């Protein structure tokens, strides 16, 4: 029997272990997409307790607790923090087979040196012991980042953000991790949402411009793009339930924008035309700045309207959509490519049925001298588990070049989530090690080890052109 969460966790043979211990384990981390707060990094305040550090904002855990029948009072409600933690501890054993079970125990082991399964029998002891440790200097947000061997972090930021805390961090010589903003213009694109006019008004306030025409709106967005670029931004990020593509000209887009600001209803086709126009315009702007464009495709968000009204978005009521994406993705990428304005692009899909669609799509759009210009992104959200990661890796390898893959990201709001990179690295080494053991690859460990290191760190640093700003 293999011991639970041993040093050789997920490493099944000598090849897995050599790849992991010799090549993967000690590679730095570039967490190029996450939802950490730059303000919390800057302020670097100790966490009050484990609920604040571990459960706050974590809709993965909230969702599991709801599925286990925990009352909302003990999830997002007014129950004392200790009672919320104990409710989570009681839920943990029920998460077997879910990555939450592994993540929970990897995080406890990595940061708190706790090696036993967490459950209802020891939750109170774990609460007390971990809370004592959280008051130590080694458990502040910055210390946790540095202890995790992180070199760079890509946050997720609205175009109207002042980037005040990014500026403070960039000027702080005592913190050596690069905290880089990411331009996330969902508010500009989601013209169908009730909040669209308010977002345009906010952009108007930030830029000091009247945004009553599409030209003025684009000019304001361009100002913000330049502002983000001046503060180190290397990429954009887009949430897409479906990829938009309907042929459109500028005059149509201007008319649609005016209608929306006049509070006139838009058809679905008009919504898609506007999004197609703006995504094309943004893609050109990203390419001109040398940015990476990220698409997160296929999530059906806020499905429970009752809970959306009660708790707001991003609270655990999203799921996998089944929309058709192949045609629109190809058309939108091609529209940019034929104009010589396709930036480096990462395509993530939450629906694993689309894996081969995107893994094959990336080979359509290459550029002479550029390795892996368009990437099939890491297994995301509901795929962020052993089977999902293996499937993403093998699907990519089957129809593309796994060796050029830019690897793992946390997509997390927690400073304790970096063991997910170790989880990924073990799965990667297990996969390649199994190919060696089965005779599918020769035992050229230096060659495969270099590919492992590239996937863990080197490729993403090259891809985001960060060689001059991060250290090995």
Curated annotation (Swiss-Prot):
Task: Give the matching Pfam families.
Answer: UxaC
What keywords is this UniProt entry annotated with?
Isomerase
Copy the pathway line from the protein's UniProt record.
Carbohydrate metabolism; pentose and glucuronate interconversion
Protein EC: 5.3.1.12
Q: Its Gene Ontology molecular function terms?
A: glucuronate isomerase activity
Superkingdom is Bacteria
Q: Which reaction does it catalyse?
A: D-glucuronate = D-fructuronate; aldehydo-D-galacturonate = keto-D-tagaturonate
Which EC class heads this enzyme's classification?
isomerase
GO biological process terms held by the UniProt record:
D-galacturonate catabolic process; D-glucuronate catabolic process
Q: Does the keyword Acetylation apply?
A: no
Q: Which family does it belong to?
A: Belongs to the metallo-dependent hydrolases superfamily. Uronate isomerase family.
Q: Mind telling me which NCBIfam families this protein's record contains?
A: PRK02925.1
Q: What is this protein called?
A: Uronate isomerase
- The protein's organism comes out as Halalkalibacterium halodurans (strain ATCC BAA-125 / DSM 18197 / FERM 7344 / JCM 9153 / C-125)
Q: What is the primary gene name for this protein? A: uxaC
């Amino acid at each position: 029997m293999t011991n639970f969460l041993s040093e050789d966790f997920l490493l099944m043979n000598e090849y897995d272990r050599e790849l992991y211990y010799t090549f993967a384990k000690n590679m730095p981390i570039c967490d190029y997409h996450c939802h950490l707060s730059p303000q919390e990094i800057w302020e670097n305040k100790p966490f009050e307790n484990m609920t604040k550090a571990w459960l706050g904002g974590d809709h993965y855990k909230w969702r599991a607790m709801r599925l286990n029948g925990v009352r909302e009072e003990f999830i997002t409600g007014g129950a004392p923090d200790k009672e919320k933690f104990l409710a989570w501890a009681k839920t943990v054993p029920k998460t077997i087979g879910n990555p939450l079970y592994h993540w929970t125990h990897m995080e406890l082991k990595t940061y708190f040196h706790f090696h036993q399964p967490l459950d209802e029998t020891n939750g109170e002891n774990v609460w007390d012991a971990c809370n004592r440790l959280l008051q130590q200097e080694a458990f502040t947000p910055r210390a946790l980042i540095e202890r995790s061997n992180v070199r760079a972090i890509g946050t997720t930021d609205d175009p109207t953000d002042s980037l005040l805390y990014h500026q403070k961090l960039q000027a702080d010589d005592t913190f050596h991790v690069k905290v880089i903003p990411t331009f996330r213009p969902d508010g500009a694109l989601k013209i169908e949402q009730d909040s669209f006019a308010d977002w345009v008004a906010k952009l108007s306030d930030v830029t000091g411009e009247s945004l009553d025409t599409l030209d003025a709106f684009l000019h304001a967005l361009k100002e913000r793009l330049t502002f983000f670029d001046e503060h180190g931004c290397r990429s954009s990020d887009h949430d897409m339930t479906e990829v938009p593509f309907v042929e459109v000209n500028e005059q149509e887009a201007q008319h649609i924008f005016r209608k929306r600001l006049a509070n006139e209803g838009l058809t679905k086709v008009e919504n898609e035309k506007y999004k197609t126009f703006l995504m094309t315009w943004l893609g050109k702007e990203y390419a001109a700045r040398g940015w990476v464009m990220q698409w997160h495709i296929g999530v059906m968000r806020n499905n429970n309207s009752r809970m959306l009204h009660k708790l707001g978005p991003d609270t655990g009521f999203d799921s996998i959509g089944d929309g058709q994406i192949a045609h629109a993705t190809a058309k939108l990428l091609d529209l940019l490519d034929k104009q010589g304005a396709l930036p480096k692009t990462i395509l993530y899909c939450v629906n694993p049925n689309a894996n081969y669609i995107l893994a094959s799509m990336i080979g359509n759009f290459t550029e002479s001298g550029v390795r892996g210009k368009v990437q099939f992104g890491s297994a995301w959200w509901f795929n962020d588990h052993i089977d999902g990661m293996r499937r993403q890796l093998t699907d990519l390898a089957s129809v593309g070049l796994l060796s050029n893959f830019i690897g793992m990201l946390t997509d997390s709001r927690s400073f304790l989530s970096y063991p997910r990179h170790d989880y990924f690295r073990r799965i990667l080494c297990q996969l390649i090690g199994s190919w060696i053991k089965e005779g599918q690859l020769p035992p050229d460990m230096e060659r495969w080890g270099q590919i492992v290191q590239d996937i863990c760190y080197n490729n993403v640093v090259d891809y985001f052109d960060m060689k001059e700003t991060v250290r090995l």
